[in-house]
């Protein structure tokens, strides 16, 4: 469990290299049927659920994880989060920090996979 928390700390340190998160919660709880992200952050004016995957999981386990996010999405409980802007509601993107690319999908969620925050930033950079 210690190496897992060190992984979360490492991601935080990578985030502040670019910009200090407005909010960074470690292992926030959303209810037993819903997802259990390693962190929730508001970073660069966008909300993210962060999963730090140092272990390799099966496609089924990863899809089950995503399905829990889907359940939370459909519950609309996220509309009531204190960080939500007054006028419009945003469901956070999911950022999976992993060395393995998983074949997972969702029609409702924005899912990013990268081995580090810098690789994630590279993937967002406009290709000239």
Predicted regions and their residues:
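Solvent-exposed, charged helical/coil patches
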Residues: 1-17
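Active-site metal-binding core of divalent-cation-utilizing nuclease and nuclease-like domains
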Residues: 12-48, 54-64
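Conserved beta-strand termini and adjacent loop/short-helix elements that scaffold enzyme active sites
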Residues: 26-29, 97-99, 114
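Short, solvent-exposed polar/charged micro-motifs at secondary-structure junctions
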Residues: 32-36, 105, 123
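Catalytic cores of nucleic-acid endonucleases
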Residues: 54-111
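Charged, structured surface patches that assemble and position nucleic-acid processing machinery
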Residues: 108-128
